Amino acid sequence: MTMALSTQRTTKGKAASLKRRHTRVRKKVVGTAVRPRLVVTRSTRHVFVQVIDDAAGHTLASASTMEADLRASGDDKSAKAKAVGVLVGERAKAAGIDAVVFDRGGNRYAGRVAAIADGAREAGLAL
C-alpha cells in the first residue's frame, strides 16, 4: 500500500518537527542522580514513561500502557495515561526518588502528556 505524496510529506514533516522540538527540550532538561528525568514517549495508541539518570545512563523506573493490567482496562487513552503516571510515580518512590525533571519529549503539554504529569504528582513525585 502506498501513501499519497502529500501524506508522505506531512508525515515526514511531523516527525521532523517532533524531533526538532525534542532536541530543543533536551538542551534544557538534564536528569541527575538526585533529580532524574521523567521521559514521556507517546505513540498514537500507547504511552511509555521512563525515569532516567542521565549521568549514569540508567533507567530507574518505567511504566507503559503495554502492561497487562492497563491494556485490559477499557478506559480511554487519557485515563490510561494518568494510570501510567501514577504507576511510574509509585515505582519511582519505591526506588527512593522524590523529585524528577519532566521531559515531555517534544510533545505539547496537553492531553495524555499532562495526564501523565498529573498522575505522577498524585503518586507523590515533585515535578
Curated annotation (Swiss-Prot):
Domain of life: Bacteria
UniProtKB keywords: Ribonucleoprotein, Ribosomal protein, RNA-binding, rRNA-binding
SUPFAM superfamilies noted in UniProt: Translational machinery components (SSF53137)
Annotated region (Disordered), positions in chain: 1-22
Gene3D superfamilies: 3.30.420.100
General function of this protein: This is one of the proteins that bind and probably mediate the attachment of the 5S RNA into the large ribosomal subunit, where it forms part of the central protuberance.
Protein name: Large ribosomal subunit protein uL18
Species this protein is from: Kineococcus radiotolerans (strain ATCC BAA-149 / DSM 14245 / SRS30216)
Name of the gene this protein is made from: rplR
